[in-house]
């Protein structure tokens, strides 16, 4: 699943995920309020010619107002492919796996 699919899945079923990490995806159709309780870490590349970074930046700003835990990493010069293949670093994966889904 790509980054846009992660945004859609996380917003449709926020109660299923302890945290999400959409990479090089477009959240344009997502309501930020649906992710208010879901930690989000997203990665975008400035050289990505498929996904525009501006909507992601704007969405993450809205989400940060609702959610205390949001991270946007912008990788300088990374293409769409490089963003999709290089984003899964130990640091980022540890961030994901250190979250525990609430039973609430």
Q: Positions of the model-derived regions?
A:
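C-terminal catalytic histidine-bearing segment of alpha/beta-hydrolase fold enzymes
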Residues: 39-43, 49, 53-104
């Amino acid at each position: 699943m790509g980054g846009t699919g992660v945004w859609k899945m996380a917003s449709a079923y926020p109660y299923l995920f302890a945290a999400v990490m959409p990479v090089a995806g477009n959240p344009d159709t997502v309501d930020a309020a649906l992710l208010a309780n879901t930690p989000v870490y997203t990665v975008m590349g400035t050289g990505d010619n498929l996904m525009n970074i501006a909507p992601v930046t704007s969405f993450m700003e809205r989400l940060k107002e609702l959610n205390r835990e949001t991270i946007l990493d912008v990788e300088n010069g990374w293409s769409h492919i490089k963003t999709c293949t290089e984003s899964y670093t130990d640091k980022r994966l540890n961030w994901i796996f250190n979250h525990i889904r609430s039973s609430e």
